[in-house]
Amino acid sequence: MKYLKPFFLVTDIGFIIYWIVTFFNLIPKSWAFKDYDNSIIIAWNWSFFPLDILISITGLSSLYLYNKNREVWKTFALISLILTFCSGLQAIAFWVYSNDYDITWWIMNLYLMIYPLFFLKMFIKRDKDETSESFRGAKTI
């Protein structure tokens, strides 16, 4: 959790700030991605809102649960990491299909795709070790 906590805080609080800024139309046109005024693109962008907020809820909840020494924090963290990867992947895939290569938005979404991979590996390894251990103790028929 030592290394994961800063990523969760930056990402989860970042999402909350992004959606507040987006709701109040505070993003300058020069910073916005291509076709930001297009109603279809606006709908596409807002389609991420439930996913991004769920990422923030699960990520921040995992930090809270970790501080309360509740083992379930790992489940919340894993869900948050998977959803974060998916959020970044969806945006990158859309921009590839629409041939849009704005480096600023790509960097932010590649961050969302890449950072979870380092931590997912630790969760998967941990689960794999636990599964192997439970199979060793199982009786065969």
Give a label for each model feature.
Residues 34-42, 97-111:
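Non-cytosolic membrane-interface motifs at loop->transmembrane helix junctions
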Residues 112-133:
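Membrane-water interface at the C-terminal end of transmembrane alpha helices
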